[in-house]
Amino acid sequence: MKNYDEWAHVFKLDPNKEITDEALEAVCESGTDAIIVGGTDNVTLDNTLSLFARIRRFPVTCALEVSDLEAITPGFDYYLIPSVMNSQHVSWVIGHHHKAVKEYGEIINWQELLLEGYCVLNGEARVANHANAQTDLDIEDVVAYARLAEHMYRYPFFYLEYSGKKGPIDVVKRASAVLEKTKLIYGGGIKNAADASEIAAYADVVVVGNGLYENLKEALKTVEAVKEHKCR
Amino acid sequence: MKNYDEWAHVFKLDPNKEITDEALEAVCESGTDAIIVGGTDNVTLDNTLSLFARIRRFPVTCALEVSDLEAITPGFDYYLIPSVMNSQHVSWVIGHHHKAVKEYGEIINWQELLLEGYCVLNGEARVANHANAQTDLDIEDVVAYARLAEHMYRYPFFYLEYSGKKGPIDVVKRASAVLEKTKLIYGGGIKNAADASEIAAYADVVVVGNGLYENLKEALKTVEAVKEHKCR
């Protein structure tokens, strides 16, 4: 198992999307640091378990990004808990956590939980609407969220989420500059080695999600691109 | 200066309330572990500075509980930052923090900041209305907030706020039972030694606020009552 603070590249697989055994094998054996299982729509216990069982055949680190209380199941190496810092509704900042802990507080293994301070920045993405995110932010707003994540809340992760399109590199750069202990995750629009390499210059962790469903071959090249960057 | 994790008794002074020099001296020399400066209404830079300057003549630890961005001033030993965990509006959970850090992020000394996970429980109190708190909670809700504060957010403090009336001892007891590293602060309706002693059996820190404006002599006796309890 690869410890979360050593991650540089991760693939994010959506339980609600189809993936062939061959493609899944290529993803799991790609040399990526971890697979995150997570999605926005129709994440159920059934499709989560089904995907999890297929991934578990490979020795790759596997984390569940918890989006639905009903879809939590034991056995993952980590449980990533998003807090949407720029949501306009308390349920996405703390409410879902409270509900989960009220129900499962006594049996949770807290060591496996990792908080992600999300900053959702693509207003056209499903997740922005779903989580009622205020995406009309300037770069100083984002920097302030990064500082909150690092110093005030001491989250393990700060997650710049552009979901579906690539965000401006300046935002990644500025957020990176104020983070030390908190790891910067970047997700959104990474489809090939060049995309990944550009982001890896600043983000600690590059997430490749949709890209692998669109062009697997190109998506697989992001692993090497990120690793090369980190080994320089 | 007394480190925050050694506090057992604190007095909370409201910048918007009058206190004579004699009373202030008695409070500061009472043996309490710290004075918290904070209030809900009409906290201004002027009245905060004025109270602070008077307290600083004494060698007691002094913390500012930040409620208004305009009333922040350097020189306090600690800055307590409330996050109202059961607020129904994001501004009380994270919004005010974001605004403050956007403005002052570069000059903040993060070592002096202490997060307080507030659970505001007296629906009739000004603060509940002000912070739009959902006070209709059962004991399991409160326990879940305590667990969130301890394990998920790792706040230094979890604050049971009954502001103006005494809360049920069972709530204090149950919250206390799930907290280890996070210190349990209790505030609300503590007017005399008996009140303080009862709460000190479970809370790490007993706050005496309004009581000292109502009957100073009785309020001062709470210091000894808490200390006695902790030394048993």
UniProtKB/Swiss-Prot annotation, chains A, B:
**GO biological process terms, semicolon-separated:** glycerophospholipid biosynthetic process
Q: Which UniProt keywords apply?
A: Lipid biosynthesis, Lipid metabolism, Magnesium, Metal-binding, Phospholipid biosynthesis, Phospholipid metabolism, Transferase
Q: Does the entry feature the keyword Mitochondrion, yes or no? A: no
Q: Which cofactor does it need?
A: Mg(2+)
* GO terms for MF: heptaprenylglyceryl phosphate synthase activity; magnesium ion binding
Q: Which residues bind Mg(2+)?
A: 14, 40
Which residue positions does the secretion signal occupy?
none
Q: Which reaction does it catalyse?
A: sn-glycerol 1-phosphate + all-trans-heptaprenyl diphosphate = 3-heptaprenyl-sn-glycero-1-phosphate + diphosphate
What CDD domains would the database entry show? PcrB_like
The record's listing under InterPro entries reads: GGGP/HepGP_synthase_I, GGGP/HepGP_synthase_sf, GGGP_HepGP_synthase
What is known about what this protein does?
Prenyltransferase that catalyzes in vivo the transfer of the heptaprenyl moiety of heptaprenyl pyrophosphate (HepPP; 35 carbon atoms) to the C3 hydroxyl of sn-glycerol-1-phosphate (G1P), producing heptaprenylglyceryl phosphate (HepGP). This reaction is an ether-bond-formation step in the biosynthesis of archaea-type G1P-based membrane lipids found in Bacillales.
Assembly with partners or alone:
Homodimer.
Put simply, this protein is called Heptaprenylglyceryl phosphate synthase
- Name of encoding gene: pcrB
